[in-house]
């Protein structure tokens, strides 16, 4: 496991074991979550989201199931904003 919150593109690709073109194709198809904007010219993927997708693949989930999971993961990002307000 890692203590990182984000993976940059290369690390995210390595952790999914996908080629670069496949990685971005999966994002376009909704099979991987889109990146989070980290700065003006930097993006990253939440480690927890990449791990969740990998677990779903290991469990043999269908592409339809994974698309639903991606939607849930992206929607749950708004909780970070809500948690920040409560601190």
Where are these regions (language model features)?
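Surface-exposed, Lys/Arg-rich phosphate-binding patches that contact polyanionic backbones
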Residues: 15, 35-36
């Amino acid at each position: 496991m890692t203590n990182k919150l984000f993976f940059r593109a290369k690390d995210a690709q390595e952790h999914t074991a996908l080629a670069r073109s496949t990685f971005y194709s999966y994002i376009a198809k909704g099979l991987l979550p889109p990146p989070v904007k980290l700065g003006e010219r930097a993006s990253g993927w939440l480690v927890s989201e990449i791990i969740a997708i990998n677990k779903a693949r290991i469990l043999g989930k269908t592409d339809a199931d994974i698309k639903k999971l991606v939607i849930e993961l992206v929607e749950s990002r708004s909780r970070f904003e809500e948690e920040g307000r409560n601190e």
